[in-house]
Structure formats: structure tokens, C-alpha cells
């Protein structure tokens, strides 16, 4: 089989638009970009070409409306649905297209967490074997992860073909995962992010949001601090993901997916984050034309200027990272017992342990969590954190020393760390940046 023609449904959304660009450029496919209006579709074509920095691919991009779906779908080798994250909207699309899909076509959904089995069952029985989850990460031009999620009905040979196509043609880092809540990357990433949001509320008297983000900055192995990441993806999207995980899981970390009240308050006020220029953070231009970053103060419910925090452990880590002395950097973290250093180290330890828990539920390959976090979030992979902290034995000692006995009992530490790979395929040194 060859994928020459693709229909992307919901192509005006951020993911639908960006993925259209990937199919057209890397996949060299003709792409029908179907939107609810032609005006939206034409704007989406221009954005898609720009997203992959190749305006020449515009000739591969065809604007279309939902009224055109029967003809577009009948021509397509792959139909990629990227509409709103709710079953009702997706079922409406399925009813629109089901009678027009070729029996050899691939039906993919870009859902970030809805049940693939449940979506498959919305299709006529004869099409269920052709349906599969294909979860990309934004922006896909730089974040190469593609989670492939078969349903219980998915044809195995078709799944193998799609994985190879995504790897070879679309140049993706492909991870096959089970149909579990939020799959793999988002389950790990949003556990970390939402617990950081919870800690901001716990430590609101110390500064709250920007205080926790300063503790978990770039020097801890991620391009963007965690709470700022929630602001970047959108607080409504963040809520949808963590609510889904909370409602559909029963593991030891379930309570860390409870959305903090202050985030719900911001959502209710329409302050959804960067996409509306106001959320957990906002940028204000003063009278002199200078941009000043403000942060939401949880206690007062107002915005204040973002603080410049100075933590001795962070300064030592950053100085050592600049010098390339990684052992000294992590020694300064492990040997500092300030509240900020304790929070930082505990988050790194819990990140590793939850990653291992999640990957065992979603994959047969423990390295899959490393691939998911490195190429889906740009975060230091969890197994690489173990390497950075001194190896498995040192990591186990740190976990026993720094986590509460109650949490350790729920985690079942020795069982969780049993049969770990010898190390990560990724070099941790490329992820820990000398920046706060």
C-alpha cells in the first residue's frame, strides 16, 4: 500500500493544520484540508505550509469544507480525524464519512486520550479493523513523537504498515502504546505538570506559580518550566487531559491529577493561557514599550510582576552545568537540604517512578517512556535521570531517603525498579541546561 492522498478533518485546528503540513511535506501526499468553512480552510493551508517552513508544499494542500468530505474521503488512502476532543463531535464526523471510506483505507484519529476502542466501535463493523490512534505532539516539526495506538479490532498488518510509514516517510519517533488513559507521553508529562500546579497552591505564600517554576526550570531537564507549559498548551486542554486521567485510572498517583481550584477559576474567566494572552502568566507592555511578564497570584486572584528568584542550589547547579561538571551539579542538588532543593529533587525522583509505572501499563518496552518524553515533550528521559543521579542503586537510596514512607509504600519501590534496563539510550547531558 502507498499513501498518496490524505484527508485531514478539522484541519484549521492547531494539530490538524500542523499535521497537514507534515503529511504534505515529509509524506509528499496530496492533502485535503477539511474545515467547517472554506475561509477557515484557505487560512489553514497558508498556516500549514508555514509550519513546516516549506511554502512550496502549498500545491499539495487542497482547501475543503465538510460538505466536500464524501468526495475527499473516497479518494483518500488515509483519513486523519482531528476535531474537538469529545465523543459526540467525533461520532458526528464518523457518521458523515463512514459510507464513503474505501475498505483498504486507513482511518486514524489524532485524539490525545479518548478511548481508541470506544471510538472504533462507532464505526461500522467492516471498518473497525482499519481504525487506529495516531497521536502527534505539537509542534510536530520539532517534536517528532508519534504514538500509535491500535484498538482491539485493529488489523495487525495495517498497524505495522502505519508504524513503518510514520517512521520512514514522516520521519517520526514511533512508539506503540496500549489504549490506556492519555496513552503514555501525556500521562507522564501531565502528572508532573499538574502536581507542580498543586505545589504552587501549597506554596502560594512563598510565591506560588513562578516560585515552583523557578525551582523546576531548564536546569532540571526541560525546555520550559512545568506550569508555564500548562499555560502554553492551554488551561482548557490541560483540564481535559488531567480530568480524563483522574476519571480513568486508579494508580498510586491518581490524586496528583486533581485540577487545582485556581486553574478552574481562570478557565471560568476565559483566561486560558498563552493562546488568549492571559492565564497563569501574561505579558504587559509598559508606557516605555518594554515587555514585562506578570504571573497570577493565587492568594489575591490578581496579577503581579514575575519574581526573579535566587536559590543557592540552583545557582551552584547552573554554574556547574556551564562548566560541564555534571557530577558537581547533581551533588549540589543532592547535598542541599533547603526546601527548594528538596522539592526539586523529589520531583525528579517522582518523575522517574511514575514514568516507569505508566510505561509498564502502556508498553512492553521500558525505553518507550524515554522516547516519549525526549521526543514528545523535549524533557530529559526518565531513565536518563537515573543515570544523572548516579545509577540505579544511588537512585533507590535517594528515593528511600527523600520520599515519605506512605508514598513509598504505595509506589512499591523495589518492585517498580525491578528489571530496569542498564541505562538510557539518551545522554542526559544534552537535556540539563545551564539556565533557570
Regions found by a protein language model. Name each.
Residues 1-436:
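N-terminal glycine-rich phosphate-binding loop for ADP-containing cofactors
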